[in-house]
């Protein structure tokens, strides 16, 4: 599940993912003194959450002066639990849930270096190159105007050359994505797991996405 934190003027502040209501309260302690979020939206996919769990989350947020304003879920019981606590709760299909996930403004810089796992539901976008040190889990979406480099395992969706750059590429230590896109060309990830012990790179050749070994000193 994912919390979207917003300020007094409904401006986006930050989003983060968590599981089984394991929330680091120190996170809020640090955040509240710097950016003072006023409200939060909870977005859950395929998760059944009862009213007791939601009440617990609501209490944690209220202790940090954050109001749980909205719940968006594709699970009807979760929606009913939210309504029982008088929280504005909406049932949405999975594709509509994705529209509730804003991009972190800090990810709109030209070149981005992200350290850590990119979890399901997370989105990272760069106006230049995107460098990720960590794994990209299934359900995560990463994109860049230029190249995407993952120093880890790529299981999610990767989109390079989103501004029309046909020379863009996607490279990873372990390249097994759900979907690859370079410029306007889209390909489903390979059915077989990578067998080699070397990094791989996906590039465009003859309007097709091909995957080949990637050596750090090679010139593309």
From Swiss-Prot:
Signal peptide limits: none
InterPro entries membership: CAP/MinC_C, MinC, MinC_C_sf, Septum_form_inhib_MinC_C
SUPFAM superfamilies named in the record: Cell-division inhibitor MinC, C-terminal domain
Keywords tagged on the record: Cell cycle, Cell division, Septation
Self-association state and partner proteins as the record states: Interacts with MinD and FtsZ.
Family, similarity comment: Belongs to the MinC family.
Function noted in UniProt: Cell division inhibitor that blocks the formation of polar Z ring septums. Rapidly oscillates between the poles of the cell to destabilize FtsZ filaments that have formed before they mature into polar Z rings. Prevents FtsZ polymerization.
Protein name: Probable septum site-determining protein MinC
């Amino acid at each position: 599940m994912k919390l979207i934190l917003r300020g007094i003027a409904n401006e986006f502040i930050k989003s983060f993912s968590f599981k089984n209501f394991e929330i680091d309260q120190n996170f809020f302690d640090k955040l509240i003194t710097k950016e003072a979020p006023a409200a939060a939206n909870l977005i859950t996919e395929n998760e059944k959450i009862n009213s007791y769990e939601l009440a617990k989350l609501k209490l944690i947020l209220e202790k940090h002066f954050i109001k749980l304003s909205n719940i968006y879920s594709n699970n009807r019981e979760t929606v009913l639990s939210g309504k029982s606590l008088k929280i504005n709760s909406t049932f949405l299909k999975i594709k509509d849930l994705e529209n509730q996930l804003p991009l972190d403004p800090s990810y709109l810089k030209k070149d981005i270096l992200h350290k850590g796992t990119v979890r399901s539901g997370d989105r990272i976008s760069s106006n230049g190159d995107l460098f990720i040190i960590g794994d990209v889990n299934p359900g995560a979406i990463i994109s860049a105007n230029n190249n995407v480099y993952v120093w880890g395992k790529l299981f999610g969706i990767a989109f390079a050359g989103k501004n029309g750059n046909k020379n863009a590429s996607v490279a990873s230590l372990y390249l097994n994505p759900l979907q690859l896109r370079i410029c306007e060309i889209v390909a489903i990830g390979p059915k077989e797991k990578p067998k080699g012990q070397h990094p791989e790179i996906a590039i465009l050749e003859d309007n097709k996405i091909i995957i080949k070994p990637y050596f750090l000193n090679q010139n593309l």
